[in-house]
Amino acid sequence: MLALKLSFAALAVAIAAPTFAAQPPYMDDRSTAASLVRSYYNAINRQEYARAYTYFGDSNAPQSYASFAAGYANTASVTVATGTATDDGAAGSTYFTLPVAIDAVSTSGAHTQFAGCYTTRLVQPGIQDPPVTPMFIFKAKLSPAHGNIRYLLPQCAP
């Protein structure tokens, strides 16, 4: 009888316990333009907006941190697709242009797609003094799009 009561108690706890969505594993890879952009959206998906904000570098963020974080208040998740990056060298830096398409899911479950180009910048590590600046998002331009993100990747001029 005690075993039966314990079984019902365990079942009641299991039913009443909230179900949490699995959080994606942490990713912070700034070695290529594609991995940098995937890491950026990994931070968004984990609601680590301060980490996401740092992917724009020390002085390249498009807006204040408060506005940036507030812009994701109704975002539940983002799926990203990337194309092939092209590179363009400049004195001491390499710029990479990357086609990107995303599917953003709101907290209400609505899906919205965007497509565009990200430009990342790598200041050559061999010419830097500490602290070394890793690759960062130099600029990003996304526009509304519709459809499967695998087919929305645009052509990006270097």
Where are these regions (language model features)?
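Bacterial N-terminal signal peptides that target proteins for export
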Residues: 1-8
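N-terminal signal peptide c-region/cleavage motif recognized by signal peptidases
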Residues: 16-18
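Exposed beta-sheet edge and beta->alpha loop/turn motif
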Residues: 91-158
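Short solvent-exposed beta->alpha transition segments
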Residues: 23-24, 34-35, 39, 49-95
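Short helix-capping and inter-helix turn/linker motifs at the boundaries of alpha-helical repeat units
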Residues: 27-31
